[in-house]
Amino acid sequence: QSDHWVLGQLPDQGPSPLFAQFGLAARHSVPRHGGESVAEVLRAHGVKFVFTLVGGHISPILVACEKLGIRIVDTRHEATAVFAADAVARLSGTVGVAVVTAGPGLTNTVTAVKNAQMAESPVLVMGGAAGTLLQGRGALQDIDQMSLFKPLCKFCASVRSVREIIPTVRKALAIAQSGTPGPVFIEFPIDTLYPFHLVSKEFGVKNPPKGIMGKIVTWYLHNHLNNLFAGAWETRDLFPLPVHIPQATDDQVQKCIELVSRAKKPVILLGSQATLPPTPADNIRMALESLGIPCFLGGMSRGMLGRDSALHIRQNRRDALKDADLVLLAGTVCDFRLSYGRVLSRHSKIIAVNRDKTQLLKNSDMFWKPTVAIQGDAGSFLIRLSQGLKGHKCPEDWPQSLKAGDVIKEKADEKTDHHLNPLRVLHRVDELMADDSIIVADGGDFVGSAAYILKPRGPLRWLDPGAFGTLGVGGGFALGAKLCRPESEVWIIYGDGSLGYSVAEFDTFTRHKTPIIALVGNDACWSQISREQVPILGSNVACGLAFTDYHIVADGYGGKGVQIGRKDEDKLDDLIKEAQKETREGRATLLNVLIGKTNFREGSISV
């Protein structure tokens, strides 16, 4: 349940202005500022990176974090900062942190924050704001930020005094990780972050009104200032608050053990939620192997079973679900990706496990009905299920029959009318990709093909936006991934359309020494849309792009750009290996691959 509040409304807010002078009066001589309090809490919570696009409202936070050894990574767009924080949250098991300036700096993050909400990523967004006395009075970049972010975040708070910073940040970090993880937002008015002497100077009234009104104004400002800093530097606990994660009951687990033990054709659909902390991904993999049940992996769970597991089924999911006598939805939601539940057979027993009650039962009143619905953590549930079924294994002929039909229906060796066959390009990348690679998916048609062909080598090695289908995640996700796993090879799979959102982050990759490889499928078209728009509506309007020299753009930002066309087909492997070598030597690389049209993804659009 969302928790939105302004600290001034809380019982433990601290002294009111009337009592600010007593006991907790501001220590005027202390040369500290509120940004230091923020930084201290972040360090105590193990935060290693803060992503930002700098602004005067938030400078104290950035400077203080850097002094405490927290790495400040500045991007070329605020959305990238949040996407990078999202990637850090997914890969590190901690909260990702982004700090942006007030007004337009914050509104630029809206799509990225909504994406984190729908992807269930614990992200802390901290935004600057106009001073406490100037909000609503026409100050620079002053808008009602709280109303904007309440629908997007689990928790929103506006700090009203310096002493509230530490408890607010601690609470936000705990809420971000509890229950169903998600983004949280804290607004910092500028006068809660800067030192007393500077704020005091701004509070000074030039030529105050004469008489009683002048005295009242002077008293009010003095009292407000004192209250703003009262108790600011009292010793407070900095360390993490408990995080609550819902779990299945013993009775629920036992009932599921009985159902699975009787099943002849069970299937597991594993979703991103199964990768959430605290259960290590390797433990979940061992549990799945122990169960021996064929699995379809989606979202962040791609790669959970490694590259070539006999249990990982990639194709013909609809047919498998029609034949299955038991389906376990482990963090998987019956939304558009499962045709709102219509692909589930009414004859199957269905076990659904999800931390979020709404997602757990989505569309269950229309197209499907769970036999057992568990509001709990999918990862730990799978561990307990496998422990309860020790000695029992799914009949081997069932996964073997599904695997036999698991052949990609493709024509990778066919020549396209122009340029390279995208399927061939992707096959060569999959063959040459390092075993420690992390794949970032940012695009439509080309990325859709990549999802079939590229095989993540292990858990937490595939990053895509999730249910929101957001374009533009590539630069930020790759930045966060490379910082978390500096020794890993990080690939961004871009469509030429989606590249436009974050190609400027090649500047960030260069400045922050985070070398990645961007593979751009350049067909000069928004092909995901064009595939359906043209046959249905008879027009390609707004779908056309150009065979732009994106490799030159990468060069201009300090990276290494290479164009690959049909004339380069015989040396495709060499060019891919050269890109890998460039990144090992510290240089971000962009492969601008000119691709032709195939019919591989006809009928693939989802609306």
Predicted segments with their positions:
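Active-site diphosphate/adenylate-binding microenvironment
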Residues: 38, 53-56, 61-63, 401-487
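Active-site nucleophile and cofactor-binding loops and adjacent substrate-binding regions
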Residues: 53-55, 73-83, 98-105, 160-163, ...
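Thiamine diphosphate
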Residues: 134-143, 281, 321-323, 366-367, ...
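Glycine-rich phosphate/diphosphate-binding loops that line cofactor/substrate pockets in enzymes
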Residues: 11-14, 37-47, 87-93, 175-180, ...
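Glycine-rich, anion-gripping cofactor-binding loops and their flanking helix/strand elements
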Residues: 90, 99, 269-359, 456-488, ...
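A short, small-residue-rich loop immediately preceding and capping a beta-strand
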Residues: 42, 48-52, 71-73, 91-130, ...
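Glycine-rich, acidic loop regions that bind phosphate or pyrophosphate groups
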Residues: 5, 127-169, 187-193, 200-208, ...
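Phosphate/pyrophosphate-binding active-site segments
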Residues: 14-29, 199-204, 208-247, 254, ...
